[in-house]
Amino acid sequence: MDTSRVRMLLSLLALLQLVAAGSPPRPDTMPRGCPSYCHCELDGRMLLRVDCSDLGLSELPSNLSVFTSYLDLSMNNISQLPASLLHRLRFLEELRLAGNALTHIPKGAFAGLHSLKVLMLQNNQLRQVPEEALQNLRSLQSLRLDANHISYVPPSCFSGLHSLRHLWLDDNALTDVPVQAFRSLSALQAMTLALNKIHHIADHAFGNLSSLVVLHLHNNRIHSLGKKCFDGLHSLETLDLNYNNLDEFPTAIKTLSNLKELGFHSNNIRSIPERAFVGNPSLITIHFYDNPIQFVGISAFQHLPELRTLTLNGASQITEFPDLTGTATLESLTLTGAKISSLPQTVCDQLPNLQVLDLSYNLLEDLPSLSGCQKLQKIDLRHNEIYEIKGGTFQQLFNLRSLNLARNKIAIIHPNAFSTLPSLIKLDLSSNLLSSFPVTGLHGLTHLKLTGNRALQSLIPSANFPELKIIEMPYAYQCCAFGGCENVYKIPNQWNKDDSSSVDDLRKKDAGLFQVQDERDLEDFLLDFEEDLKVLHSVQCSPPPGPFKPCEHLFGSWLIRIGVWTTAVLALSCNALVAFTVFRTPLYISSIKLLIGVIAVVDILMGVSSAILAVVDTFTFGSFAQHGAWWEGGIGCQIVGFLSIFASESSVFLLTLAALERGFSVKCSSKFEMKAPLSSLKAIILLCVLLALTIATVPLLGGSEYNASPLCLPLPFGEPSTTGYMVALVLLNSLCFLIMTIAYTRLYCSLEKGELENLWDCSMVKHTALLLFTNCILYCPVAFLSFSSLLNLTFISPEVIKFILLVIVPLPACLNPLLYIVFNPHFKEDMGSLGKQTRFWTRAKHPSLLSINSDDVEKRSCDSTQALVSFTHASIAYDLPSDSGSSPAYPMTESCHLSSVAFVPCL
């Protein structure tokens, strides 16, 4: 019986049933034969679409209309299909049973469904293809059996499916290709066997599938292919062998003369032989990246006149550029992750139609002229070894729109290298060795990246880039030329505190300003408004300038400027005076005065660092952007940062040592015990200095945080390493202050309990306590700033942060000597002794005066000797040297003063 007679018979039967059942359903009433729990709608005048999906059904509805053309029973709990239950649905064209619990489909389950075209059985529990249930569905065009547990396909299960076009068998448990079952599918056009467990494809596996156009075999375990496994696939255009275990190039593809798209990436293929695609002249696209390819035949890609795209990523052993003779239509070439060191001079002769060239992550050192590739639109050469861009390399590439030369070693670019690129809009030269940048011919650029070129410190005029929208520069100061000055950051606060507000909101706000600005000319006000809008729409330049990357002034405010100058002058002058009075004679210095003198020396270094910053601010006043990159990246900034951290940490460590020394000294004097020798103290001082030196060196070794800003200090925000460094310093210094506080608390508690009846050097104990209190108070803002940064607290304004870093941090170096000069009587005594010594040496130049004073000096020496003898333990309490026989002029003068000093309690 032919097809026309079958159709006539079906139409006659349908007409008879229609007459028996009455008139067809009306649109305004519930269609007859629609289950109450399903959703139904008319499909034309007579047919019905029934949707019973996701209702938790455990069996098929029994009262379905014979005119049902579409039935969706997916996402239910149906586990059985009774035989002949659906045989009445002669007009059914699409049946969906996906997402159920079917484990078996009996013979006759689909009997009578002569109009069925689409059958969906995916996401069930089938372990094999139904052996007889699918037979003789002559109208079936699409069959989905994917996402089951099918491991067996009976040889005759697809018998009679002469109209089947699409077959899904992916995501199952097949271990081989069911050759016998496919022999009856001569009309099949697309089939997927992906996501199975197939290990091998035998010869003639698809021998009778002459109409097959698309074949997916990806994500299997295929490790070998029969040399004739693809024989008979005369119409195949797409072959997907990706994500398998192939060890050898699939030479079986040579019989696929109509193949257009081939993919075998993510395998274990190590070589591509010569003339590998000689039998595939219709190839348009090849994907075989992510293979450990070590060898590619020079002629592997020759004579592929239809090839449009060639992608080969990760072929790490390729050292030569392939010969592409006869592949003149290639439009996109990607050869990344290889070891190609040079390009042939004839590359553009072979590829005149090339539009995209990606040779990134190679070892290219030199580039030939690419002027013959007139159609090039995109070139990607990042991560190579290119040193120089010559004048003729990119000449006359009128269609080139994107050029990526990032992460090379480019140090030289010819002034006219980009002069004939009128269509170029994106240029990436980041992370190179550029010290200059040619701007000729780049008027059309919209995106420019120059970040990472630390030697490129000069400003680039914005007038050369009228179309620029996004630019990335090595230094924030270079963004000042593109409207990125500090006043730009004030505009959002002036006009709108909400960043999401629109320009219309700005205009509404301006409308209210006219009433309060009667004295201003309307035209001038509108002009100012338009200028502000231009600023708001300025070029997006990064890194943006700001308070810590200023365009005009290093210090910003006059308060900071005056504070830095005052701190620097006082720190240098006062510490120099203290150090001079302490170290004016090298013969003998008491332990506490030695510590005060060393603290004064390191505080001088802090004054030097502040003075250098003040001088830089003065010389760059109003034009810091022109010198900011030079200063920030230079050795001077590193020296300033190193001196600042070294001086700050040394001062804290030495102050801690002074507090401990005072406590230990008081303990020894109260018990008349011998103190530790001065050499031990000097060794500890040296250890403190070495520790501070190590701490100050860490930023130089760990990425040079000193160059992070023109302030030359590790900022307590930004990079995690810098924040961690600052927090570690705060914790270490806090520990030092805690130790000092505990030591002095114990000392004063002992004094209150009367454990010490007398204390000789009361002034030094009080002075050290004053230093401790002052330094601790001044360190609190620094500690708070560091911890607030760690906790991402952003309520502290940048000006306050700059004030803390530039004024508060070096302030102890200024106050320490002032406290000693103003409040400590030892300074007055030292100055008096210095005056006496000066007069003594002045008289020594005159013999008459010397003879007159010799008797007086001798008398004083005797008096001082008597004083020393009367106090048997004076050498212990006074920190006198063990050798008291020496009697130089100055020490004897100072020792004479000791006879008049009595032991008094320090209360």
From Swiss-Prot:
Cytoplasmic face residues: 583-595, 660-682, 745-775, 824-907
Cysteines joined through disulfide linkages: C34-C40, C38-C52, C348-C373, C479-C541, C637-C712
Extent of the signal sequence: 1-21
UniProt entry tagged with the keyword Glycoprotein: yes
A cellular component annotation (GO) from this entry: plasma membrane
Places the protein is found: Cell membrane; Golgi apparatus, trans-Golgi network membrane
Domain LRRNT: 33-64
Intervals, Extracellular compartment: 22-561, 617-638, 704-723, 797-802
LRR repeats: 44-64, 65-88, 89-112, 114-136, 137-160, 162-184, 186-208, 209-232, 233-256, 257-279, 281-303, 304-327, 328-350, 351-375, 377-396, 397-420, 422-444, 564-585
Molecular function (Gene Ontology), one example: protein-hormone receptor activity
GO BP terms, alphabetized: epithelial cell proliferation involved in renal tubule morphogenesis; G protein-coupled receptor signaling pathway; hair follicle development; inner ear development; oocyte differentiation; positive regulation of canonical Wnt signaling pathway; regulation of cell population proliferation
Pfam families, alphabetized: 7tm_1, LRR_8, LRRNT
Membrane topology classification: Multi-pass membrane protein
General function of this protein: Receptor for R-spondins that potentiates the canonical Wnt signaling pathway and acts as a stem cell marker of the intestinal epithelium and the hair follicle. Upon binding to R-spondins (RSPO1, RSPO2, RSPO3 or RSPO4), associates with phosphorylated LRP6 and frizzled receptors that are activated by extracellular Wnt receptors, triggering the canonical Wnt signaling pathway to increase expression of target genes. In contrast to classical G-protein coupled receptors, does not activate heterotrimeric G-proteins to transduce the signal.
Family: Belongs to the G-protein coupled receptor 1 family.
Subunit structure: Identified in a complex composed of RNF43, LGR5 and RSPO1. Also interacts with other R-spondin ligands, including RSPO2, RSPO3 and RSPO4.
Protein name: Leucine-rich repeat-containing G-protein coupled receptor 5
Native source species: Rattus norvegicus
Gene: Lgr5
